[in-house]
Amino acid sequence: MKDFGFVKTAAVCPRVTVGAADKNVDNMLPLIKGAASSGAQIIALPELCITGYTCSDLFSQDRLIESAEAALGRLILECADIGALVIVGLPVRVRGRLFNCAAAFQNGRLVGVVPKSYLPNYNEFYEKRHFVSGLDTPCDTVTLCGQEVPFGNMLFCAGNGAAVGIELCEDMWVPVSPGTVLALSGADIIVNISASDEMVTKNDFRLSLIEQTSARCYCGYVYSSAGIGESTTDLVFSGACTIAENGGILARNERFERNGAAVYACIDIKKLEALRRNSEFYDNAARYADRDIRRVDITLPELRESDIDRNFDAHPFVPSDEKVRRARCAEIFNIQAAGLAKRIEHIGLKKAVIGISGGLDSALALLVADKAFDLLALPKENIICITMPGFGTTKRTKSSAVTLTECIGAQLRDIDIVPACTQHMRDIGHDMSILDVTYENVQARERTQILMDTANKEGALLVGTGDLSELALGWCTYNADHMSMYGVNCSVPKTLVRYLVDFVADERGGKLGEVLREILATPVSPELLPPDKNGKIAQKTEDTLGPYEVHDFFLYHFQRFGASPDKLMFMACRAFDGVYSREQIEKWLRLFMKRFFSQQFKRSCIPDGPKVGSVSLSPRGDWRMPSDADASAWLDL
Protein backbone atom coordinates (compact mmCIF):
# COMPACT_ATOMS: atom_id res chain seq x y z
CA MET A 1 0.00 0.00 0.00
CA LYS A 2 1.44 3.38 -1.01
CA ASP A 3 0.92 6.54 1.00
CA PHE A 4 2.72 8.72 -1.61
CA GLY A 5 4.51 10.55 1.21
CA PHE A 6 1.34 11.74 2.95
CA VAL A 7 0.89 11.62 6.72
CA LYS A 8 -2.64 12.11 8.04
CA THR A 9 -2.85 14.33 11.10
CA ALA A 10 -5.63 15.41 13.43
CA ALA A 11 -5.89 18.41 15.74
CA VAL A 12 -8.48 17.60 18.39
CA CYS A 13 -9.97 19.76 21.16
CA PRO A 14 -12.19 18.05 23.77
CA ARG A 15 -14.48 19.85 26.18
CA VAL A 16 -12.82 19.96 29.60
CA THR A 17 -13.93 20.17 33.19
CA VAL A 18 -11.36 22.08 35.22
CA GLY A 19 -9.63 19.80 37.70
CA ALA A 20 -11.58 16.66 36.71
CA ALA A 21 -9.01 14.44 34.99
CA ASP A 22 -11.24 11.37 34.70
CA LYS A 23 -14.10 13.33 33.14
CA ASN A 24 -11.67 14.90 30.71
CA VAL A 25 -10.37 11.50 29.62
CA ASP A 26 -13.98 10.40 29.10
CA ASN A 27 -14.42 13.36 26.74
CA MET A 28 -11.15 12.67 24.92
CA LEU A 29 -11.72 9.01 24.17
CA PRO A 30 -14.46 9.32 21.52
CA LEU A 31 -12.54 12.11 19.76
CA ILE A 32 -9.30 10.12 19.73
CA LYS A 33 -11.03 6.94 18.55
CA GLY A 34 -12.96 8.87 15.92
CA ALA A 35 -9.74 10.40 14.63
CA ALA A 36 -8.05 7.01 14.53
CA SER A 37 -10.96 5.44 12.65
CA SER A 38 -10.67 8.28 10.12
CA GLY A 39 -7.11 7.16 9.41
CA ALA A 40 -5.28 9.81 11.45
CA GLN A 41 -1.70 8.75 12.16
CA ILE A 42 -0.86 11.67 14.47
CA ILE A 43 -3.46 13.04 16.90
CA ALA A 44 -2.79 16.21 18.91
CA LEU A 45 -4.82 17.39 21.92
CA PRO A 46 -4.39 20.69 23.81
CA GLU A 47 -1.94 21.77 26.48
CA LEU A 48 -2.77 20.48 29.99
CA CYS A 49 -6.04 19.07 28.65
CA ILE A 50 -6.08 16.18 31.12
CA THR A 51 -6.52 18.59 34.05
CA GLY A 52 -7.53 21.77 32.28
CA TYR A 53 -5.08 24.63 31.70
CA THR A 54 -6.81 27.03 34.10
CA CYS A 55 -6.32 25.08 37.35
CA SER A 56 -4.01 27.84 38.63
CA ASP A 57 -2.87 27.15 42.24
CA LEU A 58 -4.55 23.75 42.15
CA PHE A 59 -1.40 22.68 40.30
CA SER A 60 0.33 22.76 43.69
CA GLN A 61 -2.02 20.04 44.97
CA ASP A 62 -0.74 16.47 45.00
CA ARG A 63 -4.25 15.17 44.37
CA LEU A 64 -4.45 16.94 40.99
CA ILE A 65 -1.02 15.75 39.85
CA GLU A 66 -1.69 12.17 40.94
CA SER A 67 -5.14 12.13 39.32
CA ALA A 68 -3.62 13.42 36.09
CA GLU A 69 -1.10 10.57 35.98
CA ALA A 70 -3.79 8.00 36.76
CA ALA A 71 -6.07 9.43 34.09
CA LEU A 72 -3.24 9.32 31.53
CA GLY A 73 -2.66 5.67 32.43
CA ARG A 74 -6.32 4.90 31.83
CA LEU A 75 -6.30 6.82 28.55
CA ILE A 76 -3.28 4.88 27.31
CA LEU A 77 -4.86 1.58 28.33
CA GLU A 78 -8.18 2.34 26.65
CA CYS A 79 -6.35 3.36 23.47
CA ALA A 80 -4.24 0.20 23.38
CA ASP A 81 -5.64 -0.75 19.98
CA ILE A 82 -4.81 2.63 18.44
CA GLY A 83 -1.54 2.77 16.50
CA ALA A 84 -1.62 6.52 15.92
CA LEU A 85 0.81 8.72 17.83
CA VAL A 86 -1.41 10.52 20.35
CA ILE A 87 -0.09 13.64 22.09
CA VAL A 88 -1.83 15.03 25.19
CA GLY A 89 -0.97 17.67 27.78
CA LEU A 90 -0.68 17.21 31.54
CA PRO A 91 1.41 18.36 34.53
CA VAL A 92 4.26 15.98 35.40
CA ARG A 93 6.32 16.09 38.59
CA VAL A 94 9.97 15.11 38.16
CA ARG A 95 12.28 15.07 41.19
CA GLY A 96 10.11 17.54 43.02
CA ARG A 97 9.76 19.95 40.11
CA LEU A 98 6.55 20.42 38.18
CA PHE A 99 6.74 20.51 34.38
CA ASN A 100 4.07 21.44 31.84
CA CYS A 101 4.35 18.44 29.51
CA ALA A 102 3.20 16.74 26.36
CA ALA A 103 2.94 12.97 26.69
CA ALA A 104 3.13 10.89 23.51
CA PHE A 105 1.76 7.36 23.34
CA GLN A 106 0.65 4.68 20.89
CA ASN A 107 -0.43 1.03 20.96
CA GLY A 108 -0.96 1.15 24.72
CA ARG A 109 2.61 2.32 25.36
CA LEU A 110 3.98 5.67 26.48
CA VAL A 111 6.86 6.60 24.17
CA GLY A 112 8.08 9.98 25.40
CA VAL A 113 7.39 13.07 27.50
CA VAL A 114 8.31 16.56 26.27
CA PRO A 115 8.37 19.49 28.76
CA LYS A 116 7.49 23.05 27.77
CA SER A 117 10.61 25.14 27.22
CA TYR A 118 9.34 28.72 27.46
CA LEU A 119 6.90 29.65 30.23
CA PRO A 120 4.95 32.88 29.73
CA ASN A 121 4.95 35.05 32.83
CA TYR A 122 3.47 38.32 31.65
CA ASN A 123 0.06 39.97 31.38
CA GLU A 124 -2.53 37.24 31.97
CA PHE A 125 0.02 34.40 32.21
CA TYR A 126 1.76 33.25 35.40
CA GLU A 127 3.09 29.83 34.48
CA LYS A 128 6.34 30.26 36.39
CA ARG A 129 4.25 30.37 39.55
CA HIS A 130 3.53 26.67 39.04
CA PHE A 131 5.99 25.18 36.53
CA VAL A 132 9.70 25.12 35.74
CA SER A 133 11.20 25.36 32.26
CA GLY A 134 12.07 22.26 30.30
CA LEU A 135 15.26 23.95 29.09
CA ASP A 136 16.99 22.60 32.21
CA THR A 137 15.70 19.14 33.02
CA PRO A 138 17.17 17.20 35.95
CA CYS A 139 17.17 13.89 34.06
CA ASP A 140 16.71 12.47 30.59
CA THR A 141 14.14 9.81 31.48
CA VAL A 142 11.00 9.87 33.58
CA THR A 143 8.83 7.14 35.03
CA LEU A 144 5.18 7.86 34.35
CA CYS A 145 2.24 5.47 34.51
CA GLY A 146 4.68 2.74 35.45
CA GLN A 147 6.77 3.20 32.29
CA GLU A 148 10.25 4.68 32.05
CA VAL A 149 10.46 6.81 28.90
CA PRO A 150 12.66 9.54 27.40
CA PHE A 151 12.14 13.01 28.90
CA GLY A 152 13.09 16.26 27.15
CA ASN A 153 13.19 17.40 23.53
CA MET A 154 13.16 14.51 21.08
CA LEU A 155 12.18 13.42 17.58
CA PHE A 156 9.65 10.65 17.03
CA CYS A 157 10.88 8.89 13.89
CA ALA A 158 8.59 6.60 11.91
CA GLY A 159 9.54 3.94 9.39
CA ASN A 160 7.72 5.79 6.58
CA GLY A 161 10.19 8.65 6.85
CA ALA A 162 8.08 10.97 8.98
CA ALA A 163 9.79 12.67 11.91
CA VAL A 164 7.64 14.43 14.51
CA GLY A 165 8.73 17.13 16.96
CA ILE A 166 6.68 18.64 19.78
CA GLU A 167 6.52 22.12 21.24
CA LEU A 168 4.02 23.69 23.62
CA CYS A 169 2.12 26.96 23.12
CA GLU A 170 4.54 29.79 24.06
CA ASP A 171 7.39 27.85 22.48
CA MET A 172 6.04 28.96 19.09
CA TRP A 173 6.00 32.65 20.03
CA VAL A 174 9.69 33.08 20.93
CA PRO A 175 12.37 34.27 18.43
CA VAL A 176 14.12 30.90 18.16
CA SER A 177 11.50 28.30 18.89
CA PRO A 178 12.09 24.67 19.89
CA GLY A 179 10.09 23.78 16.78
CA THR A 180 12.63 25.56 14.58
CA VAL A 181 15.49 23.61 16.15
CA LEU A 182 13.48 20.40 15.84
CA ALA A 183 12.83 21.08 12.15
CA LEU A 184 16.51 21.77 11.52
CA SER A 185 17.27 18.54 13.37
CA GLY A 186 15.02 16.55 11.05
CA ALA A 187 11.38 17.01 12.06
CA ASP A 188 9.08 17.47 9.09
CA ILE A 189 5.97 17.71 11.27
CA ILE A 190 5.79 19.93 14.35
CA VAL A 191 2.96 19.40 16.83
CA ASN A 192 2.07 22.31 19.10
CA ILE A 193 -0.29 21.59 21.98
CA SER A 194 -1.44 24.92 23.27
CA ALA A 195 -3.68 26.93 25.59
CA SER A 196 -3.95 30.26 23.86
CA ASP A 197 -6.70 32.56 25.12
CA GLU A 198 -8.74 34.77 22.84
CA MET A 199 -8.51 38.53 22.43
CA VAL A 200 -9.48 40.82 19.60
CA THR A 201 -7.13 40.25 16.58
CA LYS A 202 -5.13 37.55 18.40
CA ASN A 203 -6.47 34.74 16.23
CA ASP A 204 -5.27 36.43 13.04
CA PHE A 205 -1.82 36.93 14.52
CA ARG A 206 -1.72 33.33 15.76
CA LEU A 207 -2.69 32.00 12.34
CA SER A 208 0.02 34.15 10.80
CA LEU A 209 2.59 32.68 13.21
CA ILE A 210 1.52 29.15 12.31
CA GLU A 211 1.72 29.91 8.59
CA GLN A 212 5.11 31.61 8.90
CA THR A 213 6.57 28.85 11.07
CA SER A 214 5.50 26.17 8.61
CA ALA A 215 6.92 28.27 5.76
CA ARG A 216 10.27 29.10 7.40
CA CYS A 217 10.82 25.54 8.51
CA TYR A 218 9.37 23.85 5.40
CA CYS A 219 7.28 21.70 7.70
CA GLY A 220 3.81 20.57 8.56
CA TYR A 221 2.40 22.21 11.68
CA VAL A 222 -0.38 20.68 13.78
CA TYR A 223 -1.83 23.06 16.35
CA SER A 224 -4.44 22.23 18.98
CA SER A 225 -5.47 24.79 21.60
CA ALA A 226 -7.60 24.67 24.76
CA GLY A 227 -11.28 25.36 24.37
CA ILE A 228 -14.70 25.18 25.92
CA GLY A 229 -14.80 24.16 29.58
CA GLU A 230 -11.67 26.05 30.61
CA SER A 231 -12.33 28.54 33.39
CA THR A 232 -13.67 31.91 32.23
CA THR A 233 -12.78 33.67 35.48
CA ASP A 234 -10.56 36.04 33.50
CA LEU A 235 -9.99 34.44 30.09
CA VAL A 236 -11.85 32.71 27.29
CA PHE A 237 -10.41 29.85 25.22
CA SER A 238 -11.83 29.06 21.79
CA GLY A 239 -10.49 25.59 20.97
CA ALA A 240 -8.63 26.76 17.87
CA CYS A 241 -7.38 23.81 15.81
CA THR A 242 -5.21 24.42 12.77
CA ILE A 243 -3.08 22.31 10.44
CA ALA A 244 -0.64 24.05 8.09
CA GLU A 245 1.99 23.07 5.54
CA ASN A 246 4.69 25.24 4.01
CA GLY A 247 2.93 28.53 4.68
CA GLY A 248 -0.59 27.44 3.76
CA ILE A 249 -3.50 26.47 5.99
CA LEU A 250 -4.72 22.97 5.16
CA ALA A 251 -7.50 22.82 7.75
CA ARG A 252 -8.91 24.80 10.65
CA ASN A 253 -12.09 24.71 12.66
CA GLU A 254 -14.76 27.17 13.61
CA ARG A 255 -13.72 28.39 17.03
CA PHE A 256 -15.90 28.32 20.15
CA GLU A 257 -17.46 24.94 19.37
CA ARG A 258 -19.38 23.72 22.41
CA ASN A 259 -18.90 19.98 22.16
CA GLY A 260 -15.32 19.48 21.12
CA ALA A 261 -13.65 19.82 17.75
CA ALA A 262 -11.47 17.87 15.34
CA VAL A 263 -9.84 18.83 12.06
CA TYR A 264 -7.88 16.58 9.71
CA ALA A 265 -5.30 17.09 7.00
CA CYS A 266 -2.75 15.01 5.13
CA ILE A 267 0.71 16.56 5.21
CA ASP A 268 2.94 15.86 2.20
CA ILE A 269 6.36 15.12 3.67
CA LYS A 270 7.86 14.25 0.26
CA LYS A 271 6.93 17.71 -0.95
CA LEU A 272 8.51 19.24 2.15
CA GLU A 273 11.70 17.24 1.61
CA ALA A 274 11.90 18.55 -1.96
CA LEU A 275 11.45 22.13 -0.80
CA ARG A 276 14.18 21.68 1.80
CA ARG A 277 16.57 20.20 -0.75
CA ASN A 278 16.00 23.12 -3.11
CA SER A 279 16.74 25.77 -0.49
CA GLU A 280 19.38 26.69 2.08
CA PHE A 281 17.56 24.63 4.70
CA TYR A 282 20.17 21.92 5.10
CA ASP A 283 23.01 24.45 5.20
CA ASN A 284 21.25 26.04 8.16
CA ALA A 285 20.63 22.61 9.64
CA ALA A 286 24.34 21.85 9.55
CA ARG A 287 24.96 24.93 11.68
CA TYR A 288 21.99 25.07 14.03
CA ALA A 289 20.59 21.54 14.36
CA ASP A 290 20.77 19.78 17.70
CA ARG A 291 23.04 16.87 16.87
CA ASP A 292 22.50 15.31 20.29
CA ILE A 293 18.72 15.28 20.11
CA ARG A 294 17.23 11.91 20.92
CA ARG A 295 15.42 9.96 18.26
CA VAL A 296 12.63 7.72 19.42
CA ASP A 297 11.54 5.05 16.95
CA ILE A 298 7.81 4.72 16.41
CA THR A 299 5.63 2.89 13.92
CA LEU A 300 2.70 4.73 12.40
CA PRO A 301 -0.30 2.80 11.07
CA GLU A 302 -0.50 2.42 7.31
CA LEU A 303 -2.41 5.17 5.55
CA ARG A 304 -5.11 3.82 3.29
CA GLU A 305 -5.46 5.59 -0.04
CA SER A 306 -9.12 6.16 0.76
CA ASP A 307 -8.11 8.05 3.92
CA ILE A 308 -5.95 10.53 2.02
CA ASP A 309 -8.44 13.38 2.19
CA ARG A 310 -6.29 15.91 0.40
CA ASN A 311 -7.68 17.75 -2.60
CA PHE A 312 -5.41 18.98 -5.38
CA ASP A 313 -5.95 22.12 -7.39
CA ALA A 314 -6.34 21.19 -11.05
CA HIS A 315 -4.75 24.51 -12.00
CA PRO A 316 -1.87 25.04 -9.55
CA PHE A 317 -0.42 27.93 -11.56
CA VAL A 318 -3.70 29.87 -11.40
CA PRO A 319 -5.14 31.18 -8.10
CA SER A 320 -8.78 30.17 -7.71
CA ASP A 321 -9.76 33.38 -5.91
CA GLU A 322 -10.58 36.03 -8.51
CA LYS A 323 -9.15 38.94 -6.52
CA VAL A 324 -5.89 37.08 -5.89
CA ARG A 325 -5.78 35.93 -9.52
CA ARG A 326 -6.11 39.45 -10.87
CA ALA A 327 -3.38 40.71 -8.55
CA ARG A 328 -1.16 37.80 -9.61
CA CYS A 329 -1.77 38.53 -13.29
CA ALA A 330 -0.91 42.20 -12.81
CA GLU A 331 2.33 41.28 -11.05
CA ILE A 332 3.38 38.75 -13.71
CA PHE A 333 2.54 41.17 -16.49
CA ASN A 334 4.70 43.84 -14.81
CA ILE A 335 7.61 41.39 -14.40
CA GLN A 336 7.46 40.46 -18.07
CA ALA A 337 7.30 44.07 -19.22
CA ALA A 338 10.10 45.17 -16.89
CA GLY A 339 12.33 42.35 -18.13
CA LEU A 340 11.78 43.24 -21.76
CA ALA A 341 12.21 46.98 -21.12
CA LYS A 342 15.55 46.39 -19.40
CA ARG A 343 16.84 44.26 -22.28
CA ILE A 344 15.80 46.80 -24.95
CA GLU A 345 17.25 49.65 -22.89
CA HIS A 346 20.52 47.82 -22.25
CA ILE A 347 21.12 47.08 -25.93
CA GLY A 348 20.20 50.62 -26.85
CA LEU A 349 17.48 49.67 -29.31
CA LYS A 350 14.30 51.57 -30.07
CA LYS A 351 12.35 48.86 -31.89
CA ALA A 352 10.99 45.36 -31.42
CA VAL A 353 9.85 42.66 -33.84
CA ILE A 354 7.12 40.13 -33.05
CA GLY A 355 5.64 37.38 -35.18
CA ILE A 356 1.86 37.68 -34.77
CA SER A 357 -0.17 34.55 -35.46
CA GLY A 358 -3.54 35.40 -33.98
CA GLY A 359 -2.92 32.91 -31.17
CA LEU A 360 -2.60 33.30 -27.42
CA ASP A 361 1.18 33.31 -27.00
CA SER A 362 1.93 35.95 -29.60
CA ALA A 363 -0.97 38.05 -28.31
CA LEU A 364 0.52 38.02 -24.81
CA ALA A 365 3.99 38.83 -26.15
CA LEU A 366 2.58 41.84 -28.01
CA LEU A 367 0.72 43.03 -24.91
CA VAL A 368 3.95 42.76 -22.90
CA ALA A 369 5.83 44.71 -25.58
CA ASP A 370 3.10 47.34 -25.51
CA LYS A 371 3.59 47.74 -21.75
CA ALA A 372 7.40 47.75 -22.08
CA PHE A 373 7.26 50.51 -24.69
CA ASP A 374 5.10 52.54 -22.30
CA LEU A 375 7.79 52.12 -19.64
CA LEU A 376 10.46 53.25 -22.10
CA ALA A 377 8.32 56.07 -23.54
CA LEU A 378 8.86 54.69 -27.04
CA PRO A 379 6.31 55.08 -29.87
CA LYS A 380 4.12 52.03 -30.50
CA GLU A 381 4.79 52.15 -34.24
CA ASN A 382 8.30 51.00 -33.32
CA ILE A 383 6.79 47.60 -32.54
CA ILE A 384 6.91 45.76 -35.86
CA CYS A 385 4.31 43.01 -36.01
CA ILE A 386 4.66 40.55 -38.86
CA THR A 387 1.97 38.13 -39.95
CA MET A 388 3.31 35.28 -42.05
CA PRO A 389 0.44 33.24 -43.48
CA GLY A 390 1.38 29.75 -44.55
CA PHE A 391 -0.27 26.53 -45.64
CA GLY A 392 -2.35 26.24 -42.45
CA THR A 393 -3.29 29.83 -41.72
CA THR A 394 -7.02 30.48 -41.38
CA LYS A 395 -8.98 33.66 -41.97
CA ARG A 396 -9.93 33.73 -38.30
CA THR A 397 -6.39 33.86 -36.92
CA LYS A 398 -5.19 36.21 -39.66
CA SER A 399 -8.04 38.61 -38.89
CA SER A 400 -7.33 38.46 -35.15
CA ALA A 401 -3.64 39.21 -35.71
CA VAL A 402 -4.40 42.25 -37.87
CA THR A 403 -7.03 43.66 -35.51
CA LEU A 404 -4.84 43.15 -32.44
CA THR A 405 -1.92 44.96 -34.05
CA GLU A 406 -4.15 47.86 -35.06
CA CYS A 407 -5.54 48.16 -31.54
CA ILE A 408 -2.05 48.42 -30.09
CA GLY A 409 -1.01 50.96 -32.70
CA ALA A 410 1.95 48.87 -33.81
CA GLN A 411 3.33 48.65 -37.32
CA LEU A 412 1.90 45.75 -39.33
CA ARG A 413 3.65 43.83 -42.09
CA ASP A 414 2.30 40.87 -44.00
CA ILE A 415 4.67 38.38 -45.62
CA ASP A 416 3.26 35.30 -47.35
CA ILE A 417 5.64 32.40 -46.68
CA VAL A 418 3.98 29.99 -49.13
CA PRO A 419 6.20 30.90 -52.14
CA ALA A 420 9.44 30.71 -50.13
CA CYS A 421 8.46 27.43 -48.47
CA THR A 422 7.36 25.94 -51.79
CA GLN A 423 10.70 26.83 -53.35
CA HIS A 424 12.62 25.56 -50.34
CA MET A 425 10.87 22.19 -50.43
CA ARG A 426 11.69 21.92 -54.12
CA ASP A 427 15.31 22.76 -53.30
CA ILE A 428 15.60 20.00 -50.71
CA GLY A 429 13.58 17.53 -52.78
CA HIS A 430 10.61 17.24 -50.43
CA ASP A 431 7.28 16.07 -51.86
CA MET A 432 4.75 18.71 -50.80
CA SER A 433 1.98 16.14 -50.63
CA ILE A 434 3.76 14.54 -47.68
CA LEU A 435 2.53 16.52 -44.67
CA ASP A 436 5.24 15.37 -42.28
CA VAL A 437 7.59 17.04 -39.79
CA THR A 438 9.69 18.44 -42.65
CA TYR A 439 6.62 20.06 -44.18
CA GLU A 440 5.78 21.69 -40.83
CA ASN A 441 9.29 22.72 -39.82
CA VAL A 442 10.09 24.33 -43.17
CA GLN A 443 7.34 26.84 -42.39
CA ALA A 444 8.42 27.39 -38.80
CA ARG A 445 12.04 28.04 -39.79
CA GLU A 446 11.06 30.31 -42.66
CA ARG A 447 9.08 32.45 -40.24
CA THR A 448 11.96 32.69 -37.79
CA GLN A 449 14.37 33.59 -40.60
CA ILE A 450 12.08 36.43 -41.64
CA LEU A 451 11.76 37.67 -38.07
CA MET A 452 15.49 37.49 -37.35
CA ASP A 453 16.47 39.19 -40.58
CA THR A 454 13.87 41.91 -40.13
CA ALA A 455 15.16 42.55 -36.62
CA ASN A 456 18.68 42.91 -38.01
CA LYS A 457 17.52 45.19 -40.80
CA GLU A 458 15.50 47.43 -38.47
CA GLY A 459 17.91 47.44 -35.54
CA ALA A 460 15.23 45.78 -33.42
CA LEU A 461 14.91 43.08 -30.77
CA LEU A 462 13.06 39.91 -31.78
CA VAL A 463 10.62 39.13 -28.96
CA GLY A 464 10.00 35.40 -28.44
CA THR A 465 6.47 34.14 -27.89
CA GLY A 466 6.89 30.51 -26.76
CA ASP A 467 5.57 29.58 -23.31
CA LEU A 468 6.64 27.31 -20.45
CA SER A 469 4.29 24.47 -21.38
CA GLU A 470 5.72 24.33 -24.90
CA LEU A 471 9.24 24.25 -23.47
CA ALA A 472 8.32 21.38 -21.14
CA LEU A 473 6.87 19.32 -23.98
CA GLY A 474 9.32 20.49 -26.64
CA TRP A 475 6.34 21.67 -28.69
CA CYS A 476 8.39 24.00 -30.83
CA THR A 477 10.66 23.64 -33.84
CA TYR A 478 14.35 23.58 -33.00
CA ASN A 479 16.02 26.78 -34.18
CA ALA A 480 12.68 28.17 -35.31
CA ASP A 481 9.98 29.36 -32.88
CA HIS A 482 12.32 27.80 -30.31
CA MET A 483 14.66 30.77 -30.91
CA SER A 484 14.37 34.54 -30.39
CA MET A 485 16.37 37.38 -28.86
CA TYR A 486 14.35 37.54 -25.61
CA GLY A 487 11.51 35.21 -24.63
CA VAL A 488 8.97 37.05 -22.51
CA ASN A 489 6.66 34.04 -22.00
CA CYS A 490 9.36 31.50 -21.17
CA SER A 491 8.17 30.83 -17.62
CA VAL A 492 4.45 31.37 -18.16
CA PRO A 493 2.51 28.08 -18.56
CA LYS A 494 -0.24 27.84 -21.13
CA THR A 495 -3.03 27.74 -18.53
CA LEU A 496 -1.76 31.01 -17.09
CA VAL A 497 -1.28 32.62 -20.53
CA ARG A 498 -5.04 32.40 -20.97
CA TYR A 499 -5.71 34.21 -17.72
CA LEU A 500 -3.13 36.90 -18.44
CA VAL A 501 -4.74 37.65 -21.80
CA ASP A 502 -8.17 37.59 -20.18
CA PHE A 503 -6.90 39.97 -17.48
CA VAL A 504 -5.74 42.50 -20.07
CA ALA A 505 -9.02 42.11 -21.97
CA ASP A 506 -10.91 43.07 -18.81
CA GLU A 507 -8.53 45.90 -17.93
CA ARG A 508 -8.42 47.49 -21.37
CA GLY A 509 -11.86 46.63 -22.73
CA GLY A 510 -13.12 48.16 -25.99
CA LYS A 511 -12.10 46.78 -29.36
CA LEU A 512 -8.87 45.39 -27.88
CA GLY A 513 -10.87 43.44 -25.33
CA GLU A 514 -13.11 42.08 -28.08
CA VAL A 515 -10.27 40.78 -30.22
CA LEU A 516 -8.56 39.27 -27.19
CA ARG A 517 -11.78 37.42 -26.38
CA GLU A 518 -11.84 36.14 -29.96
CA ILE A 519 -8.27 34.90 -29.55
CA LEU A 520 -9.15 33.24 -26.24
CA ALA A 521 -11.92 31.32 -28.01
CA THR A 522 -9.59 30.10 -30.79
CA PRO A 523 -8.26 26.50 -30.51
CA VAL A 524 -4.54 26.28 -29.75
CA SER A 525 -2.73 25.39 -33.00
CA PRO A 526 0.62 25.96 -34.74
CA GLU A 527 -1.35 26.10 -38.04
CA LEU A 528 1.32 24.25 -39.98
CA LEU A 529 -1.07 21.82 -41.67
CA PRO A 530 -3.82 22.86 -44.11
CA PRO A 531 -7.23 23.83 -42.67
CA ASP A 532 -10.26 21.61 -43.13
CA LYS A 533 -12.64 21.86 -46.09
CA ASN A 534 -14.57 24.61 -44.30
CA GLY A 535 -11.46 26.72 -43.82
CA LYS A 536 -11.31 26.05 -40.08
CA ILE A 537 -8.32 24.97 -38.00
CA ALA A 538 -7.71 21.26 -38.51
CA GLN A 539 -4.45 20.92 -36.57
CA LYS A 540 -5.31 21.30 -32.88
CA THR A 541 -2.43 20.93 -30.45
CA GLU A 542 -4.46 19.45 -27.62
CA ASP A 543 -5.83 16.73 -29.93
CA THR A 544 -2.24 15.55 -30.31
CA LEU A 545 -0.73 16.23 -26.89
CA GLY A 546 -3.72 16.11 -24.60
CA PRO A 547 -5.04 19.02 -22.53
CA TYR A 548 -2.52 21.66 -21.50
CA GLU A 549 -4.22 21.89 -18.12
CA VAL A 550 -3.20 18.29 -17.40
CA HIS A 551 0.37 18.77 -18.64
CA ASP A 552 0.71 21.95 -16.59
CA PHE A 553 -0.46 20.00 -13.53
CA PHE A 554 2.22 17.36 -14.19
CA LEU A 555 4.87 20.01 -14.78
CA TYR A 556 4.13 21.92 -11.58
CA HIS A 557 4.37 18.92 -9.26
CA PHE A 558 7.15 17.16 -11.17
CA GLN A 559 9.55 20.08 -11.50
CA ARG A 560 8.85 21.91 -8.25
CA PHE A 561 8.39 19.01 -5.83
CA GLY A 562 9.96 16.05 -7.62
CA ALA A 563 6.69 14.09 -7.53
CA SER A 564 7.10 10.51 -8.73
CA PRO A 565 5.04 9.23 -11.69
CA ASP A 566 2.76 7.10 -9.51
CA LYS A 567 2.15 10.05 -7.21
CA LEU A 568 1.40 12.26 -10.21
CA MET A 569 -1.14 9.68 -11.36
CA PHE A 570 -2.79 9.61 -7.95
CA MET A 571 -2.90 13.39 -7.65
CA ALA A 572 -4.08 14.00 -11.21
CA CYS A 573 -6.87 11.44 -10.89
CA ARG A 574 -8.05 13.31 -7.79
CA ALA A 575 -7.68 16.75 -9.39
CA PHE A 576 -9.47 15.82 -12.62
CA ASP A 577 -11.98 13.37 -11.19
CA GLY A 578 -15.08 13.41 -13.37
CA VAL A 579 -13.28 15.37 -16.09
CA TYR A 580 -10.87 12.81 -17.54
CA SER A 581 -10.64 9.05 -17.10
CA ARG A 582 -7.75 7.28 -15.43
CA GLU A 583 -6.80 5.77 -18.80
CA GLN A 584 -6.61 9.21 -20.41
CA ILE A 585 -4.51 10.62 -17.59
CA GLU A 586 -2.10 7.68 -17.76
CA LYS A 587 -1.73 8.11 -21.53
CA TRP A 588 -0.99 11.82 -21.16
CA LEU A 589 1.41 11.25 -18.27
CA ARG A 590 3.45 8.81 -20.36
CA LEU A 591 3.47 11.32 -23.21
CA PHE A 592 4.56 14.09 -20.82
CA MET A 593 7.46 12.03 -19.47
CA LYS A 594 8.61 10.89 -22.91
CA ARG A 595 8.57 14.38 -24.33
CA PHE A 596 9.99 16.06 -21.23
CA PHE A 597 13.06 13.84 -21.40
CA SER A 598 13.48 13.65 -25.17
CA GLN A 599 13.09 17.40 -25.71
CA GLN A 600 15.61 18.60 -23.12
CA PHE A 601 18.08 19.40 -25.93
CA LYS A 602 15.83 22.30 -26.90
CA ARG A 603 15.75 23.66 -23.36
CA SER A 604 19.53 23.44 -23.09
CA CYS A 605 19.89 26.35 -25.52
CA ILE A 606 16.97 28.69 -25.07
CA PRO A 607 17.14 32.49 -25.14
CA ASP A 608 17.11 34.67 -22.05
CA GLY A 609 13.75 35.50 -20.53
CA PRO A 610 12.24 36.55 -17.19
CA LYS A 611 11.35 34.10 -14.46
CA VAL A 612 7.89 34.98 -13.17
CA GLY A 613 6.96 32.09 -10.87
CA SER A 614 8.22 29.17 -8.81
CA VAL A 615 8.51 26.84 -11.82
CA SER A 616 10.99 27.60 -14.57
CA LEU A 617 13.00 25.51 -17.02
CA SER A 618 15.88 27.86 -17.74
CA PRO A 619 19.13 25.88 -18.10
CA ARG A 620 20.87 28.81 -16.41
CA GLY A 621 18.70 28.61 -13.33
CA ASP A 622 15.97 26.25 -12.20
CA TRP A 623 16.41 23.17 -14.41
CA ARG A 624 19.71 21.68 -15.50
CA MET A 625 19.31 18.27 -17.03
CA PRO A 626 21.34 16.20 -19.48
CA SER A 627 19.85 16.10 -22.95
CA ASP A 628 20.45 12.36 -23.23
CA ALA A 629 18.92 11.14 -19.95
CA ASP A 630 16.85 7.96 -20.16
CA ALA A 631 13.14 8.21 -19.27
CA SER A 632 12.55 4.50 -18.59
CA ALA A 633 12.29 4.80 -14.80
CA TRP A 634 9.73 7.60 -15.14
CA LEU A 635 7.57 5.56 -17.52
CA ASP A 636 7.03 2.87 -14.90
CA LEU A 637 3.68 3.88 -13.47
Regions found by a protein language model. Name each.
Residues 1-355, 371-380, 412:
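Enzyme catalytic cores with a strong preference for nitrogen-chemistry domains
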